[in-house]
Amino acid sequence: MIQAVIWDADGTLLDSMGIWEEALSGCLARRGKVLDRESVRVLFSMTPAQGSNYIKEKFSLSDPAEVLLSEILVRVGEFYRLEAQAKPGVREFVEGFHALHIPMA
């Protein structure tokens, strides 16, 4: 019997994986740079803080990594507050666990 459920939001509950690439691409575009596929591949194995240091160095940006990270996180936060949608069937699935009084986090 299931005793509890721990969810991973990105890509499981929410259709949200593309926002990180969009936020990074926008951050670079505002500085006249283009996010390439190889950088995307490398960045997705990093934490956001590591990623901001990586793009600062790789693209020779003058802004501090903390400024880049803040800009990226503002865009990601806007997405979660205003645009993120549950993946198909998620609401019913979660409601089913709730109806069975199974704790979720």
Spans of features found by a protein language model:
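Active-site neighborhood of HAD-like aspartate-dependent phosphohydrolases
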Residues: M1-V42, A99
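Metal-dependent phosphoesterase signature
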Residues: I55-E92, L100-I102
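Alpha-helix N-cap/helix-start capping motif
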Residues: M17-G18, A49, R91
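N-terminal phosphate/diphosphate-binding loop that engages ATP/GTP or pyrophosphate donors
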Residues: S45
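An amphipathic alpha-helix signature
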Residues: E21, S25, P48-N53, A65, ...
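Short, hydrophobic secondary-structure boundary micro-motifs
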Residues: D36-R37, S52, P88
